[in-house]
Amino acid sequence: MANPNNNNDNKQNNNNNFFNDNPLLAFAIFSIVIILIFKSFVGEGESLGTMMNTQGVAQTKQVKYSEIKKRIEEGAVKSVKLTPSMVEAIIEDNGRKVRYVAQNVPTYDRDLIPLLDKKKISYEGVVGNGFFSELISMMLPILIFFAIWIFLAKKMSKGMGGGILGAGKADKLINSEKPDTRFDDVQGVEEAKDEVKEIVDFLKFPERYIELGAKIPKGVLLVGPPGTGKTLLAKAVAGEASVPFFSVSGSGFIEMFVGVGASRVRDLFAQAKKEAPSIIFIDEIDAIGKSRASGGQMGGNDEREQTLNQLLAEMDGFGTDTPVIVLAATNRPETLDAALLRAGRFDRQVLVDKPDFEGRLAILKVHSKDVKLAPNVDLEIVAKQTAGLAGADLANIINEAALLAGRQNKKQIEQSDLLEAIERSFVGLEKKNRKINETEKKIVAYHESGHALMSELSEGATRVTKVSIIPRGLGALGYTLHLPEDEERFLKQKHELMAEVDVLLGGRAAEDVFIGEISTGAGNDLDRATAILKDMVSVYGMTDVAGLMVLSRSQNSFLGAGAVSTDYSDKTAEAMDSYIKSTLNERYGYVKETLQNYYGAIDNMAKELLGTEVIEGKTVRRIIEEYEQEKGMPSRLAHKDKVAKNKAEADKKEEALKKEISEESDNNKEA
């Protein structure tokens, strides 16, 4: 049985569609209403303004025409002005002039003029609004609003795909030609490429799958952190399949007009079907695909929700024989609506994650093809020192190194340029103009020396790459740089977390031991150390405070830490605070004792920093080794074996490079 409410809704939707589909008619109706309003206010004022120009009038009265004729017959009228639709009479009343105005007078009153002549009253005719004046008064508001309309249409045409009059139309095909990107251009995401290769095969040979009755996924969702190559991978799929590529951002569906998003989705899918086989790519789909259960929206009429509903309907409308694939990208998959991820829509999710060592090396090779590298450049070292960076970051490092080399008028990019670019990526730009006084420079030198010493002596810490007291970034007056040079690490053990805490406390402890007074420079270190210990208690179950209970739950997000929810009692919170405080005090005491045992090493390191402002990691290790030998102490360097191994590998590579250059030189001589 039909639902009458549905009929009413359909009627309302039809009415809305009528005005959306007939914008010119809507504009005409709107213009007529404006003209009527304009005439009612302006027309009368113009007529009155034309006549009311007599000076010395004390009062104006709106009266009937018969009242004016009566006054004329009484001889009280001094002068009269006439128009086809109005009569104005000036009357002397107790020594003051009063204007009587009568509107809508009879058109043919043949008695008025003879009466005025008989009473010897002066009169004159006033030219009213003629045909052209009336025409202008009617057309002026139309012209004004039409000019505004055209102005807005031109302003919004780029973003609206046809302007206001075509608000529902999708922008034209972004890539009018098929993309020339190939899978070889996308490196570091081999698993993701394998997942989407069957899509290419389906687009090239759809009949092969249709005959077998196979159902290819209608939608593939590419998820991963920013800068990992999701858009590039989507273009590569279209390029490999040689099909049209329709690309649009999720935010591009939402405009100021209600219903535009849904209409644009319909038009986009219609274009894709005409060009089939084809690919639709929706970047940042979370802009329109957020969960409807998350709240914060204004009911069923919300523009984003209408757009999402239309997208779901269009994806349901695909048949199994329609060779159109929808690719979408997001770095916030946890916010997407469940209906969008169900089977038959975006039922396949492909992780496009940050690359590992091999992936970073491949990406660096791709981006370094078009730049001139010096023979001594070792991209493997760069790949090892850029763990955790995405493909976009690596491309930026190559470009930044090229810019640095260009500023120094170099002919080739050297290894030092690449290392400086990496440093910029991790700790920011050098602040050469920020001058710090000698006292603060001394504090920073000992602070960073404390970090460096604990990094080298703590088992599980990352060894030092460089120590600097040159200000960088937003607020750092100095820094100790730790760049990984070993294998990829995905887990951290308890002793490694405690080593991080020791390294963070090393700066404050050095100030305490060598300066005799602490500064505000350790604020961020203490914050990070506290956060590590808190996670050990509430997330990792590494202490006896809560045992194996998880007290804090965070929502996974590729954009960093998501929302954290806590669910524990005040008593547990008190126990957690007590553990963190006691552990910090315990580790701080251990770090201070270690620094006192290596007093001379810290002192020498700080003096070296004050003299040169920057020292390399190998210099830090040399100073520590010399002090240990001087005092007859057993070596506590945690990375001694790794350093020896890396040095041997570096010497071997250098020897091979020299041999290669020598052989090339001999060949040139023979030629």
Swiss-Prot record:
- EC number of the protein: 3.4.24.-
| Subcellular location per the Swiss-Prot or TrEMBL entry | Cell inner membrane
Q: Which residues form the active site?
A: E448
User: Would the keyword Hydrolase turn up in this protein's UniProt record?
Assistant: yes
Annotated GO molecular function terms are: ATP binding; ATP hydrolysis activity; ATP-dependent peptidase activity; metalloendopeptidase activity; zinc ion binding
Q: Does the keyword Membrane apply?
A: yes
Cofactor binding note of this UniProt entry: Binds 1 zinc ion per subunit.
Q: Which residues lie on this side of the membrane: Periplasmic?
A: 44-130
Complex and partners:
Homohexamer.
Q: Which family does it belong to?
A: In the central section; belongs to the AAA ATPase family.
Q: What is this protein called?
A: ATP-dependent zinc metalloprotease FtsH
Annotated organism of origin: Sulfurovum sp. (strain NBC37-1)
